Amino acid sequence: LDEIHREFMQRIRPSITQMARMLVNSPRDAGDTLLMISATNEFITRPIAHALGVDELIAINLERGPGGWFTGEIAGTPSFREGKITRVGQWLAARGLDWADADATFYSDSINDLPMLEKVQRPVAANPDARLRPIALERGWPVLELFGAQP
């Protein structure tokens, strides 16, 4: 698995822009805890979080069978749509916190993250998809283009 991660990151690392690194480094340098939450499985997202220096990761956890192999099933609450709110709530509770304590900025490119964008104090649409972009603009949320102009 380590070799697969290395090969994967050789392809991904060049797409991590300087602006994306700045968006991660700035709050970290200010002492904030960085939490990456993704609807993609942990196997894929863990090396990306590590490359960015992100403190914590919430992702889809894949169930493993008795031999350690992935079963193809999801373990626990999927971190997708409203499930992201549930999983972050669990993460906060494990630290003796709740949503009232969270001073959060959340970046997303997907309409599927609308529930989380509506939950946080500072929603940001980053490379938003065609359905998220007009909502973000209508609500006055910042819209970032991390990969240059989007069609």
Report residues per predicted region.
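C-terminal cap/substrate-recognition subdomain and adjoining C-terminal extension
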Residues: 2-6, 10-151
